């Protein structure tokens, strides 16, 4: 994110929402199943994400230099752009050029520096925050549950000075399977419901230190087994709804 608004509570929430942006839509969870077999994981592959409601989010990603070593081990270059806005505020935009490595279902990202070196990515618009692959074991029935999780996002200090952001998700419970419309047509998908709490932290924008209050949301991930992906995430925070979904992939 190149510029961060600094006007009061909205700025604080915009900053944190930009970092969380769908916590389970592209890998904030430690284990990501099926990433190497995703529909876009090939040379020329593409994925597009769009958000609406309180959080407006867009991401256009292109995949190249893809290599697969079998199992859930692969590498790819990910290039594209992302933008995030909150409550009608102007979108913050970032250009992305990352090298992604997946080993045993866990993805890590490195940024290419001007001199050709690779530097680990810890924040900025971290692709692990986008989470299409958050369920590492098969979902087989209504009532199935997944344990609570805790993960930490380390903010890229080249973008903004901030303490690590701690995110906790409650126990996840699978609801009744339903047919929903996705970018890949009608799909029979499982709704997985849980709470997500972002712990209070603080951030410094251009030398101004702002406390960021804790935020709790009710979240529903729509996991579509035929695609092995979360294709849509719906969340509700203080009565305001947001949706982030995959709108295109090839």
Model-derived regions, located:
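Acidic/charged, solvent-exposed loop-and-adjacent secondary-structure segments enriched in E/D, K/R, S/T
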Residues: 120-131, 184
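Membrane-interacting alpha-helical segments
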Residues: 146-157
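Acidic, serine/threonine-rich low-complexity disordered tracts
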Residues: 34-118, 155-250
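Sec-dependent N-terminal signal peptides
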Residues: 12-22
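Extended beta-sheet lipid-handling architectures
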Residues: 78-80, 125-127, 146-148, 173
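N-terminal secretory signal peptides that target proteins for export/translocation
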Residues: 1-12
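N-terminal signal peptide c-region/cleavage motif recognized by signal peptidases
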Residues: 28-29
